[in-house]
């Protein structure tokens, strides 16, 4: 299936939902409205056939541009082989998008990672809590406006640093 054909078939399934299709090196990227992302992903899954795998779900911070965030879904279909990237743009300091754990249960940890590192909330997620950073961490470290100071960070389970000792070099054996 050609890239243009793939984009046209997804567009036909979602009807009046505006999709912006872009092809680069034979791979299609569809930009969809964030409020319809679940419908667009379900249509893409139907077009790609079974099995369709959510290979990756990530985000990009485009600060200072608006809309500020891109949430990016990478789908892989195997019959016939095809890859499709679908993006949704989100604005504001507290962006929210619908969870796709209903379509792909494996999106659970991917959505938690994006939430933890970018602060993007996934509405309807069954357990949206931090997955990489400590529970008491303030902020989201992959945001471009995240403070990069040299301040010491205090963790809940702080273990005092053990002083290092320099072991003297032993004299050469004779």
Please state what every model-predicted region is.
Residues 1-174:
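Terminal low-complexity/charged segments
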């Amino acid at each position: 299936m050609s890239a243009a054909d793939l984009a046209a078939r997804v567009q036909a399934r979602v009807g009046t939902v505006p999709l912006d299709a872009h092809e680069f090196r034979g791979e299609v990227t569809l930009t969809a409205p964030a409020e319809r992302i679940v419908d667009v992903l379900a249509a893409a899954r139907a077009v790609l056939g079974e099995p369709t795998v959510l290979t990756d779900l990530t985000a990009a911070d485009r600060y200072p541009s608006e809309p500020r965030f891109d949430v990016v879904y990478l789908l892989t279909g195997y019959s016939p082989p095809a890859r499709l990237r679908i993006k949704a743009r989100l604005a504001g300091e507290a962006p929210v998008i619908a969870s796709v754990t209903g379509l792909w249960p494996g999106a659970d940890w991917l959505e938690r990672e994006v939430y933890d590192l970018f602060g993007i909330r996934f509405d309807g997620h069954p357990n949206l809590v931090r997955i990489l950073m400590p529970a008491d961490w303030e902020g989201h470290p992959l945001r471009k406006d995240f403070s990069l100071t040299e301040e010491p960070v205090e963790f809940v389970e702080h273990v005092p640093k053990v002083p290092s000792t320099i072991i003297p070099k032993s004299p050469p054996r004779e």
